[in-house]
Amino acid sequence: MISLMEARNLRKERTGVVLSNKMEKTITVAAKFKEKHPIYGKFVSKTKKYHAHDEKNECNIGDTVRIMETRPLSKTKRWRLVEIIERAK
């Protein structure tokens, strides 16, 4: 059986770039990933946007961040900021 702490660490994580920080305590993060085309087999680059909770309003546009899945915080927010990997220059 998985303990409570292990279950918390099994949540999904994404790494991406901050696109917007105009909302109060919320950032928009663009996460890139590659997906195989079902017919042709070529890997296609795709981007998905996530709204993430930034408790201290510490992110700026262009920062590379890590976000983690969490309970629903609003209609569109289901992710929270874990760490800022690299600051924008």
From Swiss-Prot:
InterPro entries: NA-bd_OB-fold (IPR012340), Ribosomal_uS17 (IPR000266), Ribosomal_uS17_bact/chlr (IPR019984), Ribosomal_uS17_CS (IPR019979). The keyword rRNA-binding applies. GO terms for biological process: translation. Keywords: Ribonucleoprotein, Ribosomal protein, RNA-binding, rRNA-binding. PROSITE patterns: RIBOSOMAL_S17. CDD domains: Ribosomal_uS17. HAMAP family: Ribosomal_uS17_B (MF_01345_B). This is Small ribosomal subunit protein uS17A. It comes from Bacteroides thetaiotaomicron (strain ATCC 29148 / DSM 2079 / JCM 5827 / CCUG 10774 / NCTC 10582 / VPI-5482 / E50).
